[in-house]
């Protein structure tokens, strides 16, 4: 009985093992597990794509809002400049009327009144410009940058006006 040697029994064991694997539907379970994993990966990819698109939409929206804010800031600055020009023109007109009405006064009093009027106009223009700059900086910069820029601007305004 040569066919009853160890090789034969190993072969029979292999055949029985393979039959058991097929009987227990292991290949089907493996295929189902792989299909489930593929579905999970597909769902994760779809979710990632959806999140990316949502992020793109948010980015576009925030860029639009930033542009609107910049345009509004530019409008505010332009309005402040126009108002400063009007105030300057109005102050100049008042100063000229004051000087014309007071020609009988001495030359020293006229010069003193002009100096005071110019300082008042400059002070009002500086206050308006600083307020506009504060508004713009409050919208655009963080606290540290705002503080630094404000300090520099005030120093420059003081040196130029004095």
UniProtKB/Swiss-Prot annotation:
Source superkingdom: Bacteria
Predominant location: membrane
CDD domains for the chain: ATP-synt_Fo_b
InterPro entries: ATP_synth_b/b'su_bac/chlpt (IPR002146), ATP_synthase_B_chain (IPR050059)
Keywords tagged on the record: ATP synthesis, Cell inner membrane, Cell membrane, CF(0), Hydrogen ion transport, Ion transport, Membrane, Transmembrane, Transmembrane helix, Transport
GO molecular function: proton-transporting ATP synthase activity, rotational mechanism; proton-transporting ATPase activity, rotational mechanism
GO annotations of cellular component type: plasma membrane; proton-transporting ATP synthase complex
Spans traversing the lipid bilayer: 3-23
Bilayer disposition of the protein: Single-pass membrane protein
Keyword Ion transport: yes
A Pfam family: ATP-synt_B
Keyword Transmembrane helix: yes
Cited NCBIfam families: PRK09173.1 (NF006611)
Subunit structure: F-type ATPases have 2 components, F(1) - the catalytic core - and F(0) - the membrane proton channel. F(1) has five subunits: alpha(3), beta(3), gamma(1), delta(1), epsilon(1). F(0) has three main subunits: a(1), b(2) and c(10-14). The alpha and beta chains form an alternating ring which encloses part of the gamma chain. F(1) is attached to F(0) by a central stalk formed by the gamma and epsilon chains, while a peripheral stalk is formed by the delta and b chains.
Role of this protein: F(1)F(0) ATP synthase produces ATP from ADP in the presence of a proton or sodium gradient. F-type ATPases consist of two structural domains, F(1) containing the extramembraneous catalytic core and F(0) containing the membrane proton channel, linked together by a central stalk and a peripheral stalk. During catalysis, ATP synthesis in the catalytic domain of F(1) is coupled via a rotary mechanism of the central stalk subunits to proton translocation.
Membership in a protein family: Belongs to the ATPase B chain family.
Name of the molecule in the record: ATP synthase subunit b 1
């Amino acid at each position: 009985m040569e066919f009853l040697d160890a090789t034969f029994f190993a072969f029979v064991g292999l055949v029985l093992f393979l039959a058991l694997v097929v009987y227990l539907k292991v290949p089907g379970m493996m295929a189902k597990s792989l299909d489930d994993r593929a579905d999970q990966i597909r769902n994760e990819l779809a979710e990632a794509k959806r999140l990316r698109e949502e992020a793109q939409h948010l980015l576009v929206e925030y860029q639009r809002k930033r542009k609107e804010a910049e345009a509004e800031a530019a409008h505010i600055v332009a309005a402040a400049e126009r108002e400063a020009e009007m105030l300057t023109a109005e102050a100049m007109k008042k100063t000229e009327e004051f000087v014309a009405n007071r020609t009988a006064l001495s030359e020293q009093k006229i010069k003193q009144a002009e100096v005071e009027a110019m300082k008042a106009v400059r002070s009002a223009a500086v206050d308006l410009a600083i307020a506009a700059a504060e508004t713009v900086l409050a919208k655009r910069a963080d606290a540290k940058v705002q503080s630094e820029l404000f300090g520099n601007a005030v120093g420059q305004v003081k040196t130029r006006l004095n």
